[in-house]
Structure formats: C-alpha cells, structure tokens
C-alpha cells in the first residue's frame, strides 16, 4: 500500500488519503475536488476541469489507501461521490470523519481552533473553493484529534475504551476502529469491557438508576455515537462547554441520554447523585447560600410555595407559579435554570418587556457570584449584543433574558 511515506507515529495517518469536494448546491454536481496524502511530497490530485476525467483519476489515486478521510465526509463527500459513480461506493467501507470525531476529542471550551464547534462544525479554513487546502487541513485536524485521544487514553483510559466500542458498531466503522486501536494499542473492546468502562467513567456523575437502564441498551447499535457524545459532554459538564448544535440535530439521542442520566430524580435514597443534584434545598444552598426556602407563603399543608415551585420546575413539570411581591419569585426560575444548565447544558430563555427588570435580575445573580446570565434587548450597543450572543453560542450563558421584539431577529 505504501504510497505515503511513514512520517507519522500513527499508522492510521500513513494509510489514509484526504478528500475534499466542492459541490454546486443547486445542481448537486461536483465542480472541483482534491485528494492528498499526508506528507507534502506525496502525490496529490487537484481538479477543477473535466470532472469525469478527474473522478477516474481520483479512483486510481485512492487505490492502495485503506481509509479516505474528510471533514463531514460521511454526510457530504461520500454520498456525492457515490451519486457520481457507483465505483466510489467502496470508499465508504472504512472512512474517517473528523467532524464526527471532534466533539469527542475536544469537548471542552475553548474547542479546536480550526472547527466551528458552536455552529455547523465546518472547518475555519479562511479559503473559498480551495479543496486542496481543505484536504490538507483535515490531516492537521485529525492529527490534533489523535493527539487529544492519546492524552485522554493516558489520563482516562476508560473514556477511550468506551469511545472505541461505541463508535465502531456500524458497517462503516473500520476507519474509526483502526484509529482507536492505533491510539489504545488494543483491539476493539467487547460489550462487557465497554460496560465496565462506562460504569466507572460515570460513577457519581449521573443517576445510578438511570445508568443501569442505559447500560442495558449497549447492544443497540443505533445508540453508539449518541452515547459517545453524551459521555463526552458529561465529562465536561458543569462548565461552559456546549454540545455542538449539529450533534443535537443529527444525533438527537445524545441530548436525550444526557437528560435521562443527569436530569431525572429517581427518588432512590441510595442514589448519591440525585440526593445531591436533584434536591431543591441543596440547589438553593449551592447557588444562593440559603439553607431553607422562605416559610411564607405556604400551601394548605404548610409547605413553602417557593420550594414547591422550584421542585416542580426541577422535575420538568409545566406550571404556573403566582407569588406576592417581595416573596422571592426570581429564584423560582433561577434555581431550576441554573440546575438544568449544570446538569445538561440547557439554556433557559426568559422573555420580559422590562429592561430595568432584566438588569436587576442579572445584577442580583452577579452579587451571588453567578455570572452566567445575559440580556438581549434594544438598549444594548452592537458590541454588547454581540458579546451576549457569543456567550450563548459558546456555552457561557445559563439564562438568557430577552425582550419580545428581539425574537424577530434571526441572530
């Protein structure tokens, strides 16, 4: 196979060719393409001429390489190549997609500097219609990802064991299997080894009851990547990191698994996670430093209404809470919002026409040491608005207070 020189310590890189296509979105036709090997002296194919001839040359160029790699190659490049000619169907046998790997390798904010993590995940190449540049950039991103996985394997081998199992369940997983085996120095783990790794990885970080039911679904191959993304986000939960929007869109089960594991109160006293993280009083103490809710107003059984409202909201119930002025209405939404952000990364949107009230809410939380609330209203300057929206996109905001007219803006 030796088309590429063995210049890397990672065998998988030496056995790969990077492909990038430029496609006319209206006609769904390829108008330019590039294929490159890892080292700069390796043969490369670049074409923006007769595409039929270029496709034939591309097919010949890829012979001898075990893997085709690319950024969004699974959902973009390979389908277009297969549509152009059936001879390219074989390329999909063992591809490696750097888009799919990036949330696992770089889940924490700041994310990889070349990937638009908080948007659609595309590369920040700075070049327009330059497939050769983008194809070479993919090697740079992949090498960074492998380096991150190697470090993860050193500090948390259970995480990489879990990823190796979860990401290699489909018929197209040969490339990912080669990559993880290369980094781990071991073949793909079996289901029991993966189960043990995930159990240890999530111990104390999720509800033990929900973890048991989730582990029972490990044989469901459709949940492989979603579960990997859920594990990756949970590893950085409680900070300012977000699950990429494209992951939530393409792998919706990932967010569902996070909610199931971290935002459901099982009610079992033996579950240390739920005792700590799903208890309204402990949440009140954590965020605002108070041991108890206000005793008044109370319901007919003497239970503080503040606590009842917070408890219902933390349990995900729909509710209407009405309290007199000066009885602490704000914490009735702030505690559930902060708790949910901490547990699942969810953003709570509060719609209010009162700009002064927004500022008062943010200042009140700031006095309690909470800096994760932002406002968007017509009184902000453009730099202030941009800063607020950036905090939302990057995962710095738990609560967004926004005026109704701002909802008309597409930004």
Predicted regions and their residues:
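Conserved DEDDh/DEDDy metal-dependent 3′-5′ exonuclease domain
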Residues: 39-112, 120-122, 131-149
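Conserved SF1/SF2 helicase motif Ia
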Residues: 322-327, 332-377, 395-398
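Acidic, Mg2+-coordinating catalytic module of metal-dependent nucleases/exonucleases
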Residues: 114-208, 212, 217, 222
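Interdomain "pre-motor" coupling segment immediately N-terminal to P-loop NTPase/helicase cores
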Residues: 220-279
